[in-house]
């Protein structure tokens, strides 16, 4: 079971971003990153951090360690804050944890929420952090727009909308 997860993304051509998952038996696999930094064609740097739910009993049985997600996310955000223009968090923690994270870490610009399959048709803002959620069963696709002013180094607007997939061509 340990090796199955350890080698799951060996051939992936993308980063797997999970800041609170660690291999217990050996070094973390090369594909496992606490964060990644993306750069747009306009030079905007976007830090992306991700975390999974604290299912420690499940991961322990597989030989993996999962740590307290909010603490780990906040630590990564502190590391990223001076390196990037925008910070996005991919959260598989659930709406309650996302709301607590938004209260504790206003440096995050957007939290992409999952786990509880909540639906925010136009996002939900807490403490300046935009929370998103697209429900379940692939019913909706989320569309996030961030308007960033390069002169001031500030986000001017951020908004989410969800599109009902049944209405797409």
Which residues does each predicted region cover?
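Acidic, metal/ion-coordinating pockets
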Residues: 1-168
């Amino acid at each position: 079971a340990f090796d199955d997860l350890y080698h799951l993304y060996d051939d992936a051509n993308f980063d797997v971003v999970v800041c609170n998952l660690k291999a217990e038996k050996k070094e973390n696999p090369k594909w496992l990153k606490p964060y990644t930094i993306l750069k747009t064609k306009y030079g905007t740097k976007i830090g992306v951090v991700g975390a999974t739910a604290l299912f420690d009993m499940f991961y322990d049985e597989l030989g993996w360690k999962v740590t307290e997600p909010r603490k780990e996310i906040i630590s990564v955000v502190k590391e990223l804050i001076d390196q990037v223009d925008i910070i996005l968090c991919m959260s598989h923690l659930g709406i309650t944890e996302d709301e607590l994270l938004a209260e504790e870490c206003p440096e995050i610009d957007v939290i992409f929420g999952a786990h509880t399959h909540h639906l925010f048709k136009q996002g939900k803002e807490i403490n300046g952090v935009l929370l998103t959620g697209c429900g379940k069963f692939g019913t909706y696709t989320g569309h996030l727009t961030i308007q960033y002013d390069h002169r001031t180094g500030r986000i001017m607007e951020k908004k989410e909308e969800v599109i009902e997939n049944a209405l797409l061509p």
